[in-house]
Amino acid sequence: MTAVTAVTRPEQTDRTAVSTMDAAEVAIAADAADAADVIVLAGGTGRRLDGASKPDVVARGLRLLDHVLAGLEQLREQGLPLGRVCVVAPPEVALPCGVLRALEDPPLGGPVAGIAAGLDVLGRSDPVAGLAGILTCDAPLSWRALPALHRALVQAGPELDGACAHDGEHTQYLLGLYRRRALATAVAPGGVPLRDTAVRRALGTLRVRAIPTTRDAVRDLDTWAEVRAWDSGRSE
């Protein structure tokens, strides 16, 4: 099955989207320190996908971005204290109502700059969650790692700045949950966002615990071959 790209959708304005924002505010108000906002990185050039808009690539019947957003709502319904969701993406990527948008200025500054932009947008809302999750749209099942990361970070207390997925070989800093203030300091030291900076260089300064994570959660889709394999249900 061949994946389809550049799907456009109107902004959604249904009651479900409104109730999602209400649920985010309730989750944060209940215990702001342990509530988690989530930043989904959905920018970039899509170079290995022939320039396609990666969040709009369709596989298994949904855009890659929508797999992540739907998964987050599933976790919310299961009781994980999720706050607001902010997608770092250009204006042409359609987002559901209730999902915030951010974009580094100028665009294409790299994921570290994208995280800083997302934190800036989330920080304008009140109340503000104490934790911030980082996911990427090209890992459509990455949301499955969040409950274990949340448990690890909350149980550890202030001695840890974050908890990240580990794929058996590497710590995946872009699949992680962090204390908001520590993350903000790492990506925007002195309040100035870093640009074109390696993720490991910026986030590697934080005190994080690597949590073993299932293969499906860390699997990212960077090429058409990987998209087609995942779309068809093949392991590779």
Residue ranges and their predicted role:
Residues 2-51:
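N-terminal nucleotide-binding beta1-loop-alpha1 segment
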Residues 218-236:
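Short, basic/aromatic-enriched C-terminal tail that caps enzymatic domains
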Residues 14-20, 59, 184, 233:
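Intrinsically disordered, low-complexity segments enriched in polar/charged small residues
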Residues 10-16, 77, 85, 181, ...:
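Positively charged, low-complexity intrinsically disordered regions
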